[in-house]
Amino acid sequence: SDTVDIYDAGKILERVII
């Protein structure tokens, strides 16, 4: 979330998809 915007977005996306 600090310097990993893409990583954070991926985590949220995975949660939303699943």
Swiss-Prot record:
This protein's UniProt keywords: Cytoplasm, Methanogenesis, Transferase
Catalytic activity, EC: 2.8.4.1
GO molecular function: coenzyme-B sulfoethylthiotransferase activity
Catalytic temperature dependence: Optimum temperature is 60 degrees Celsius.
Main location: cytoplasm
Cofactor(s) the protein needs: coenzyme F430
Keyword Membrane included in the entry's annotation: no
Cofactor annotation remark: Binds 1 coenzyme F430 non-covalently per MCR heterotrimeric complex. Coenzyme F430 is a yellow nickel porphinoid. Methyl-coenzyme-M reductase is activated when the enzyme-bound coenzyme F430 is reduced, probably to the Ni(I) oxidation state.
Catalytically driven reaction(s): coenzyme B + methyl-coenzyme M = methane + coenzyme M-coenzyme B heterodisulfide
Name of the top EC class for this enzyme: transferase
GO biological process: methanogenesis
pH-activity relationship: Optimum pH is 7.0.
One Gene Ontology term, aspect cellular component: cytoplasm
Subcellular location: Cytoplasm
Biochemical pathway: One-carbon metabolism; methyl-coenzyme M reduction; methane from methyl-coenzyme M: step 1/1
Known role: Component of the methyl-coenzyme M reductase (MCR) I that catalyzes the reductive cleavage of methyl-coenzyme M (CoM-S-CH3 or 2-(methylthio)ethanesulfonate) using coenzyme B (CoB or 7-mercaptoheptanoylthreonine phosphate) as reductant which results in the production of methane and the mixed heterodisulfide of CoB and CoM (CoM-S-S-CoB). This is the final step in methanogenesis.
SUBUNIT field: MCR from M.thermophila is a heterotrimer composed of an alpha, a beta, and a gamma subunit.
UniProt similarity note: Belongs to the methyl-coenzyme M reductase beta subunit family.
Protein name, per record: Methyl-coenzyme M reductase subunit beta
